[in-house]
């Protein structure tokens, strides 16, 4: 399993922007798209904010589901609990929004079909 060091990817100890999150996302999406497991290493990272984790992790749900995520993405064992909370918040937010969107789209398609029947 390959390890991706966040500090090396973003060039900083501060994971504090969506642009930096996108840098990590681009690596992770390539791995998960090829069904390659990866460990994300937050060693030496001092700060993580939701805009970073939303882009780096939440956006992955455009291409994989939660089961695949759990199978493919791991974190360094000593990851900061606050960082993990931030990641989990982004995952929950992303999956919930996608479920709501899917339900709304299904409802809209059903209404269109009923109107055309």
Q: Where do the language-model regions lie?
A:
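Generic recognition of short, well-ordered alpha-helical segments
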Residues: 19, 51-55
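STAS-like cytosolic regulatory interaction modules
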Residues: 1-39, 46, 59-117
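Acidic, metal-coordinating catalytic cores used for nucleic-acid/nucleotide bond scission
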Residues: 44-52
């Amino acid at each position: 399993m390959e390890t991706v060091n966040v500090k090396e990817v973003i060039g900083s100890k501060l994971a504090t922007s969506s642009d930096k999150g996108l840098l990590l996302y681009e690596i992770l999406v390539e791995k998960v798209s090829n069904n390659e497991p990866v460990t994300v290493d937050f060693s030496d990272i001092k700060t993580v904010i939701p805009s970073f984790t939303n882009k780096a992790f939440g956006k992955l749900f455009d291409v994989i589901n939660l089961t695949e995520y759990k199978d493919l993405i791991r974190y360094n064992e000593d990851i900061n609990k606050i960082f993990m909370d931030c990641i989990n918040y982004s995952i929950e937010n992303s999956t919930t929004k996608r479920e709501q969107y899917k339900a709304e789209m299904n409802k809209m398609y059903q209404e269109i079909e009923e109107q055309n029947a």
